Amino acid sequence: MHFDPVADIITKINNANRAKIVELQTEASKLKVAILNILLNEGYIRGYEIYDNKEKTKSILKIKLKFDENRVSSLNGIKQISKPGLRIYVSAEKLPKVLNGLGIAIVSTNEGLMTDKLARAKKIGGEVLAYVW
């Protein structure tokens, strides 16, 4: 069975966000942590913690979503773009602007995961993993 960690974390964040759940858990991986670092730096989540799981080999990620006092999320949407069956690669000049710059695109480059704004500034392209707005 093949497993897509990007689809897993995006689906879990979307489902928890729609249900107004503040905390969620998932198995940890380096890719998931890199995605969460970007979401944290851009202000879309409150934080995350990594716990060692005694029963299993994988560590556990506890993700804290960000809501205001009226239970309105700071994350309006997150969508997977590049999928295992259809990878989407773009050059630095063709990096997409999400909602005319109001959102971000998460791009996997040869220098690691970064936002579309940072990749455009460094003039490097890569695989567009997700749109966040």
From Swiss-Prot:
PROSITE patterns: RIBOSOMAL_S8 (PS00053). GO terms for cellular component: ribonucleoprotein complex; ribosome. Pfam families: Ribosomal_S8. GO terms for molecular function: rRNA binding; structural constituent of ribosome. It comes from the Bacteria. InterPro entries: Ribosomal_uS8, Ribosomal_uS8_CS, Ribosomal_uS8_sf. GO terms for biological process: translation. Keywords: Ribonucleoprotein, Ribosomal protein, RNA-binding, rRNA-binding. Signal peptide: none annotated. Belongs to the universal ribosomal protein uS8 family. One of the primary rRNA binding proteins, it binds directly to 16S rRNA central domain where it helps coordinate assembly of the platform of the 30S subunit. Part of the 30S ribosomal subunit. Contacts proteins S5 and S12. This is Small ribosomal subunit protein uS8. It comes from Mycoplasmoides gallisepticum (strain R(low / passage 15 / clone 2)). The lineage of its organism: Bacteria, Bacillati, Mycoplasmatota, Mycoplasmoidales, Mycoplasmoidaceae.
